[in-house]
Amino acid sequence: MDLKNLSILIVDDVKTMRSIVQKMLRNLYIGKTLHMAENGLEGLKILHSTRVDLAIIDWQMPVMNGSQLLEAIRDDKHLRDIPVLMISGESEKDIVLEAAEIEVEGYLIKPLTPAVLDDKIRSIIHQIHHPDVATLHIRKARTFEEAEDLASAIEHMKYAAILKPKASRVLRNLGLLYQKIGNEKNMEKCLQKAASVNQQDVVTRHLLGEMYWAKNDLISAARYYLEVISLTKKFTDRAVLLGEALLDKNVIRLAKNIFSKIISKFSKDLSIIEKILDICIRQNELEYSKIILNGLIRDFPSNYDLIYKAGVVCETLGEVDNALEYFLTVEKHQGRRLDVKLKIAKLFYDKNKIIQADNYLNIVLRKNPNHKEALALRRLF
């Protein structure tokens, strides 16, 4: 295809960036028609309404980002063969891995130069119009799969795997075809081979983790999920649930390994770490909960809900002085909380400091004369 006659879609939320790419393409004499969109949703509307030979998509955008747009393109039978050049301002591993897994034809990091853009577009268009034999087999496999001729699909994917023995995606897709015909043994072999030839193939490792989890082989599932966590944040919610399942089965060391790896990856993400913390408290893993809380309180010293939880954990462990210190800290900053005052009263009672306990009980009962827990504690005096 003549590069001058291409219909190109440029999707970027920054107007100046769209203009820069447009100017570069004009100077390179690439593209006859240039369509512009400021987010993925607008870009998708253009793709559905007009012919596009190449899409140049920014990764980070509002409304619908580049990853979501790319996934929508690949999931649409009418759009999926459009070549995509992904552009990002970051070189983060997660972005590179995700772009590779959703089958992007090219990936560039800003700032762009005309020479690099020219080389990448020429390479993409050449690949599209001069596919290798393995790619032709992959396309035939897809056609047969959609026609529900799975036997033929498997044969063509096997040929592709022979021609590209180091292509983990081909091996993975072959495994998924075996899964469709109920051949789990061959599926497992293909996925394991895919994982072995590509140490960065996070999707295959995720599939293996899920497969072993479904078989209740939690140790094998955990082994693959530990690798997944090292590579990406994408499947974190599932990894947290697997950690909880491991605690349920009393496989404590592996559960802690998973949780610790997630926490190190999300060191500033309070919501994820609190989720893990709450699981550990529910499962009575209190010493590990203390370790998590110490880290959180160090990073979020004004989060008094965390300090309160630390008090509860220490109280449960029988560490009365530590618990009292935490609750007194909360009470100093959130003096209206009756639950905290009651905790302090109980701990003073445990320390046989009846006068201090009585003082805090009186405060609770003045606010709520019918407070059942406070009245029950008073009867112990």
Feature roles, as predicted:
Residues 61:
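Receiver (REC) domain active-site loop signature in two-component systems and cognate sites
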Residues 36-45, 66-69:
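Helix N-cap/capping motif at the beta->alpha junctions
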Residues 68, 91-106:
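Alpha4 helix (beta4-alpha4-beta5 surface) of REC/receiver domains from two-component response regulators
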Residues 50-57:
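Active-site beta3 strand of CheY-like receiver
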Residues 15-35:
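Two-component/phosphorelay signaling modules centered on CheY-like receiver
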